[in-house]
Amino acid sequence: MTTREQGTLRTEVTERDHQIGPADAPITLVEYGDLQCPHCRRAHGVLPRVIRRLGDRLRFVFRHFPITESHPNALRAAEAAESVAAQAGEQAFWKMHDLLYEHQPEWEDADDDTRILELAKEAGANPDTVAADLESDRYEEHVKEDFMSGVRSGVNGTPTFFINGRRFDGDWTTVDSFVAALEEAAS
């Protein structure tokens, strides 16, 4: 794979993806994230303000990229988020996404799914159904598809961002710097 290809999003955004914002927005931001990653949690603190500032000019897409070697509960969290989405819809997915990041220290080192299931209930899902889905690995393949789409795009860490299909390795740590990069991509 050439350097140019590694900097390109190889899997197009589809209805399968979790998205906020209009499909025809001039800016599409795709994040490959790990729900247990502390850097992704930091990005989560910036992204809602970026989304608010850009409004309908931005479509934000989240794809799972659990790095289980470093974050052993990341896959479980991603599968739980998918179970919540299947049960309660896209808004519930985003609530679960937010809750998992906001409460990350409470579940990241847990030996069981108790706290993740409590968060699933808070997000609007039936925790017994989420538990059964986790037990059967019902959404593992979905999460792995996200992961492999990241691998094909050259993702090797999280968070990794793509702006309008091009990898963004700039400063995402402040709202102003991230918005400036996004607006530049749209011009």
Residue ranges and their predicted role:
Residues G7-T8, P38, R138-Y139:
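Short, flexible loop segments at the rims of nucleotide/cofactor-binding pockets, characterized by
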Residues T8, V13-E15, E102, T129, ...:
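Residue-level signal for pocket-adjacent positions within structured domains
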Residues R10-I27:
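A short beta-strand-turn-helix
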Residues V30, L35-Q36, R41-K121:
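Structural alpha/beta surface segment adjacent to cysteine/selenocysteine redox centers
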Residues Y32-G33, H44-I51, L117-S187:
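C-terminal cap of thioredoxin/glutaredoxin-like
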